[in-house]
Amino acid sequence: LEYALIDAGWSADATGPNDSGGDITRTIPAINMPEILAYAKSKNVRVWLWLHWTNAERQMDEAFPLYEKWGIAGLKIDFMDRDDQWMVDFYRRVVKKAAEHHLLVNFHGAYKPDGLRRTYPNLLTREGVLGLEYTKWSARVNPGHNVMLAFTRLLAGPMDYTPGGFDNVTR
């Protein structure tokens, strides 16, 4: 593996996996970030962090330089789920600030691609698709849907399909 993601729930003061009030400059007590990052580095694996967009918006000026210091490879920013003018500007501010700190970006819960990655090549991908994670709660992601993506969504650029969504196999 080239990269690994530390998904939702790692940041301090979070009250749940979709918490928008956590402190993304600190971890919960159960997460020893220096130890995780050292182990990943020993295996030649770079680490990404999941962020709720509201936390990124509130703390990016403080957090992104910290992540660069930690050696974080990239950020998976989630739950924007809209494409109004303010949010489009937010995307631009994030990728610009991330580029300044050598961070890759994956916008999850994102609107359709708009060419921003041409200006900011650190914008690796964005979701904008009904991906594999939906198999945890829906039957809509099926072989026909997956084939269709190559001829529809992928024409607009790379996508975050979220491969590897796990579910409770005892159901």
Predicted regions and their residues:
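Aromatic- and carboxylate-enriched substrate-binding clefts and catalytic-loop regions
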Residues: L5-R171
